[in-house]
């Protein structure tokens, strides 16, 4: 369930102020609205605990996209477990995203993730879409050469 925030809070026995920790977690959840997983998602994830995922498709997409982008001259952080790629923007990340749109490339500015100067590109799509996108990435790279 990529993107879902599922987890739990463990409070060691050594914590003397157990109730304050619970209160702080509850306040954070009410204020921020996304700290603790909603009950519905907790129930849904319990049905998925024994499920497996074939990560070979993600790996093939990762390799294809990473290899092509680095060949075109982009500097990328090679993912080791994510379904997205961080690419160093050739200019301000928001301007770079706007330039990518001219070639129908959808990227997210890294500043949205407190990582300015980079863009995030998801590769959890059909392999054919990655293949079809490569000429556009090549044209984008040529704009900065």
Model regions: which residues?
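PLP-dependent class I/II
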Residues: 1-145
């Amino acid at each position: 369930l990529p993107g879902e925030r599922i987890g739990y809070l463990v409070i060691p026995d050594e914590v003397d102020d157990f109730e304050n920790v619970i209160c702080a977690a509850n306040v954070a959840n009410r204020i921020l609205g996304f700290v603790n997983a909603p009950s519905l998602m907790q129930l849904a994830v319990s049905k998925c605990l024994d499920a497996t995922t074939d990560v070979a498709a993600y790996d093939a997409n990762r390799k294809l996209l990473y290899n092509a982008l680095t060949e075109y001259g982009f500097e990328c952080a090679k993912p080791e477990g994510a379904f997205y790629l961080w690419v160093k923007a050739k200019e301000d990340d928001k301007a770079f995203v706007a330039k990518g749109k001219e070639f129908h490339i959808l990227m997210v500015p890294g500043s949205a993730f407190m990582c300015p100067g980079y863009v995030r590109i998801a590769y959890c799509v059909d392999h054919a879409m990655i293949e079809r996108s490569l000429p556009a990435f090549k044209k984008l790279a040529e704009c900065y050469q």
